[in-house]
């Protein structure tokens, strides 16, 4: 994988295909594999770039000066500068949508179009924030994601009726076990706290271009329920697409639907 040094740390990314650039922003706890079906489909017509989050996949640890989602947005702008890419079509899922929207607000001249999937620009509700922080404390104390937590954390990302013996579920569960102690303590846990203590920026959404923005959400997304996406789409004045038979990682649970929706949107805006 190619690498760019951003804020003193190696940021690894996929760069596949040619054409207008599509930048894919990943979910917390997932590497580039969460976009595998989209990379294959989109790279036939587009140049697809998929950076891996700090502490995830092959990327280095969270840079010391990373204190907010605005910093993540700035770091991804630095990646675009490194690659001499003036404008992108940005597709961000979960935290990828959180920093993606901030990038669009920070540098609107760099954005052709923006797709926010299974994400929310409001603050994390207090109950879920406290719950996630309690999980981070357990992970921190153990220096690993303990076995009992694997089947607490993994289901958060999928629709309720997912087959827990499926390759999709089991591969993700295995990937959670693979995080190193160093990676968890230096990057994954601090990044999680940063994500779930984010400030509310819903009042800024009206600044996004409604004609070149799309909000998408899995119909069965538990951590980011469709009501949040409906709220954001109304504030922006943009289209909303609900993804059937999908939870949080809709890109993997209903890839054909997601691919078709993205290709249709990009054909009109890229």
Label the model's feature ranges.
Residues 105, 112-143:
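Flexible "cap/lid" loop of the alpha/beta hydrolase fold
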Residues 208-209, 215-217:
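Short beta-strand/loop motif that positions the catalytic acidic residue
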Residues 222-228:
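Conserved alpha/beta-hydrolase "acid-adjacent" motif
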Residues 125-130, 145-207:
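Conserved alpha/beta-hydrolase catalytic His-Asp/Glu region
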């Amino acid at each position: 994988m190619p690498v760019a040094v951003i804020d003193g740390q190696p940021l690894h990314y996929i760069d596949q295909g040619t054409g207008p650039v599509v930048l894919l922003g990943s979910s917390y706890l997932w590497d580039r594999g969460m976009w595998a079906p989209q990379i294959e489909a989109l790279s036939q017509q587009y140049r697809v770039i998929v950076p891996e989050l700090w502490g995830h996949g092959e990327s280095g640890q969270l840079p010391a000066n990373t204190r907010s989602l605005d910093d993540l947005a700035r770091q991804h702008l630095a990646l675009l500068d490194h690659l001499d890419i003036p404008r992108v079509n940005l597709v961000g899922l979960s935290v990828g949508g959180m920093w993606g929207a901030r990038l669009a607000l920070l540098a609107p001249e760099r954005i052709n179009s923006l797709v926010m999937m299974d994400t929310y620009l409001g603050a994390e509700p207090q109950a879920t924030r406290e719950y996630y922080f309690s999980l981070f404390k357990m992970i921190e104390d153990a220096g690993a994601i303990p076995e009992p937590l694997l089947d607490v954390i993994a289901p958060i990302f999928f629709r309720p009726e997912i087959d827990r013996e499926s390759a999709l579920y089991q591969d993700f569960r295995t990937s959670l076990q693979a995080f190193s102690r160093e990676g968890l303590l230096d990057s994954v846990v601090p990044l999680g706290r940063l994500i779930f203590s984010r400030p509310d920026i819903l009042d800024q959404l009206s600044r996004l271009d409604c004609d070149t923005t799309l909000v998408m959400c899995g119909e069965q997304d538990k951590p980011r329920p469709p009501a949040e996406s409906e709220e954001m789409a109304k504030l922006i004045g943009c289209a909303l697409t609900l993804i059937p038979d999908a939870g949080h990682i809709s890109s993997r649970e209903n890839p054909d639907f997601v691919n078709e929706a993205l290709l249709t949107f990009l054909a009109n805006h890229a």
